[in-house]
From Swiss-Prot:
The modification N6-acetyllysine is found at residue 19. A motif (Nuclear localization signal) lies at residues 30-34. This is Destrin. The gene is DSTN. InterPro entries: ADF-H (IPR002108), ADF-H/Gelsolin-like_dom_sf (IPR029006), ADF/Cofilin (IPR017904). The keyword Ubl conjugation applies. Actin-depolymerizing protein. Severs actin filaments (F-actin) and binds to actin monomers (G-actin). Acts in a pH-independent manner. Widely distributed in various tissues. It comes from Sus scrofa (Pig).
Amino acid sequence: MASGVQVADEVCRIFYDMKVRKCSTPEEIKKRKKAVIFCLSADKKCIIVEEGKEILVGDVGVTITDPFKHFVGMLPEKDCRYALYDASFETKESRKEELMFFLWAPELAPLKSKMIYASSKDAIKKKFQGIKHECQANGPEDLNRACIAEKLGGSLIVAFEGCPV
């Protein structure tokens, strides 16, 4: 079911910047986005970047100690959102970083909001080619480290964002 909602160019640019890791200077790496939250525009016709709802790589360990906990705290309690999160995790063999796409549709969100976000998900996913991991979360219990580790690879994952799972 398509909703006719468009995806803003800035959303696509941010996805590309997060997906493509160029050889960068330490200053450029600090400005790279760790997480970004997207919402619908006021007229509900376009998916846009939510103002002020991002975590930069340079903030991790400086102003933000636990980036995933901070990310979860940025999600609204009573409305839906889309998000990209650059997950850092360890398997038994190696350390990895992979993008995760989230549809946040909490129980307390209005039914109309849940319907439009669910029906617009394909529009944003088509723009996000190459995403390996997708997660729909309906409450904070869906966003604990064990649930996320399961999405990333189950029993192969030994740590997520530096914390054992």
